[in-house]
Amino acid sequence: MAVGIDSKWFRRYGTGAAPRRRLVCLPHAGGSAGFFHGWGTAFDYGVEVLATRYPGRQERLAEPGIDRIEDLADEVTAALLPFADVPLTLFGHSMGASVGYEVALRLESRHGIRLQGLFVSSRKAPHKLTPHTTYLDGDEALLEEVRGLGGTDGELLDDPDLREVVLPALRADFTAVGTYGPRTAAPVGCPIVAQVGDADPHITAEDMAAWGEVAPAGFALRVLPGNHFYLVEQRDAVVRALAAHLG
């Protein structure tokens, strides 16, 4: 039972009722649990939201970041086990989609836990990724990549002191993103819902459709208005789709 468990890996948002479902949110590279703070009270009673706290930021600032998707997935999987007393759905945005996919595989193969669903957002399917590390050549190249994607507070990147604080986590995350893939198209046993913004400069609907190749249990593709961070402006639409799925 997860009642009373205090995990450094998750910020828990409850509704005051015993959970019958859990939604686990996995942030983008450079992101934090705070990105999903507005989701905590967006669902009906009985749905608990777990916003994942990656090391190297916010409450875990003193910890080193993890620079491999597989290693990050190992840690998240282990941390999730006490919360698997009710059905789990994962929502991963950008880097978080890759982490979510790897967590789904580990929960199934190592622990016999099949997710209720996997939502993947703004990230190519694992077997369609190609290594991309040119932005790791130096701090300025990395910062340019982060600015181009959006989603990170400009003040953090422009202020020299704040930049020094966030750079280690950014470098770890973008190393993980850039060195992950390609890999075989290992299927997951739960339905997958892929989402993307129609004006995303990096990911197309065709890219996201490839997730269907690892989703024998069911697949749906949703294209919403917006860019790589469409889910900020389309938050209500995203939450409605998740609520319908969670039941």
Regions found by a protein language model. Name each.
Residues 1-91, 95-247:
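Domain-scale detector for complete catalytic domains at protein termini or as standalone homologs
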